């Protein structure tokens, strides 16, 4: 079943990379955003973020009865993800409960490692903890998704 899950997400990995590349190009061209760190490191670590998000999507699909329910749950998760990730408000200024919730969201780690690599020129030694967190998130979500998928669809 992991082969089935992988075949389902591969096209979305490509789409995720296209979105990131377009965002970086627009940021650099239009907003004069500097890119101080390693582009190779950034794009390698972007893979983990894209896969983390896709693993969340797969988990949502295993819980959902239909496509509309999956879409509604995904939309329901977007706003808290953005607000708790440190994208809008600094996580240091959040109450500890909200900060803890933000640590359960993959975008939190991706924002930190993106800022470190792109804006500060940091290397892997500065982002390995965030990368590890994304890897743990992926492992937990994929494992849980496979278990849920088997319970639901495999007799």
Model-found features: residue ranges?
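Short, functionally important structural connectors and interaction interfaces within domains
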Residues: 22-23, 27, 63, 81, ...
């Amino acid at each position: 079943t992991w082969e089935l899950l992988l075949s389902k997400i591969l096209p979305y990995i490509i789409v995720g990379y296209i979105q990131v590349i377009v965002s970086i190009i627009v940021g650099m061209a239009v907003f004069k955003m500097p890119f101080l760190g390693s582009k190779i490191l950034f794009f390698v670590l972007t893979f983990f973020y894209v896969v983390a998000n896709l693993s969340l999507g797969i988990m949502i699909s295993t819980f959902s009865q239909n496509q509309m329910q999956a879409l509604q749950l995904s939309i329901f998760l977007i706003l808290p993800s953005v607000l708790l990730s440190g994208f809008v408000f600094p996580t240091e200024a959040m109450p500890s409960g909200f900060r803890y919730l933000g640590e359960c969201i993959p975008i939190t780690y991706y924002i930190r490692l993106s800022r470190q690599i792109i804006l500060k020129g940091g290397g892997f030694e500065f982002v390995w903890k965030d990368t590890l967190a994304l890897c743990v998130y992926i492992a937990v979500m994929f494992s849980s998704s496979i278990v849920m998928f088997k319970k639901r669809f495999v007799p």
